[in-house]
């Protein structure tokens, strides 16, 4: 269920401050964050944000199509290695 429009987008304040500082300095280093629940705002376009996936920080280059989505959508948390082949079925 989407968030109510009257509430506005959610973004953690510490992440918003980091984004503003990085935008002022035109810093190319990734902004490291653990806030997967924060929504991508237009101010973030062009920045690289390192989103934590539970094990490491995944660099996400934000473009215009990502605005309105959550940061966690672009850093998967589960590793899929494929189904193990059944040796009897192959014979």
Swiss-Prot record:
Source taxon at top rank: Bacteria
Entry GO terms, CC: cytoplasm; small ribosomal subunit
Keyword Acyltransferase recorded: no
Gene3D superfamilies in UniProt: 30s Ribosomal Protein S19, Chain A (3.30.860.10)
InterPro entries cross-referenced by the UniProt entry: Ribosomal_uS19, Ribosomal_uS19_bac-type, Ribosomal_uS19_CS, Ribosomal_uS19_SF
Keyword line: Ribonucleoprotein, Ribosomal protein, RNA-binding, rRNA-binding
Any GO BP annotation: ribosomal small subunit assembly
Stored SUPFAM superfamilies: Ribosomal protein S19 (SSF54570)
GO molecular function, one term: structural constituent of ribosome
Protein family according to the UniProt entry: Belongs to the universal ribosomal protein uS19 family.
PANTHER family: RIBOSOMAL PROTEIN S19P FAMILY MEMBER (PTHR11880), SMALL RIBOSOMAL SUBUNIT PROTEIN US19M (PTHR11880:SF8)
Function noted in UniProt: Protein S19 forms a complex with S13 that binds strongly to the 16S ribosomal RNA.
Cited HAMAP family: Ribosomal_uS19
Protein name per Swiss-Prot or TrEMBL: Small ribosomal subunit protein uS19
Organism, scientific name: Pseudomonas fluorescens (strain SBW25)
Gene: rpsS
């Amino acid at each position: 269920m989407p968030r109510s429009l009257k509430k506005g987008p959610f973004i953690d304040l510490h992440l918003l401050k980091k984004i503003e500082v990085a935008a002022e300095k035109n810093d190319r280093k990734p902004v490291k964050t653990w806030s997967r629940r924060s929504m991508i705002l237009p101010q973030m376009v062009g920045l690289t944000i390192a989103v934590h996936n539970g094990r490491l920080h995944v660099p996400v280059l934000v473009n215009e199509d990502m605005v309105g989505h959550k940061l966690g959508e672009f850093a998967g948390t589960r590793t899929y290695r494929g189904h193990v082949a059944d040796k009897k079925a192959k014979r």
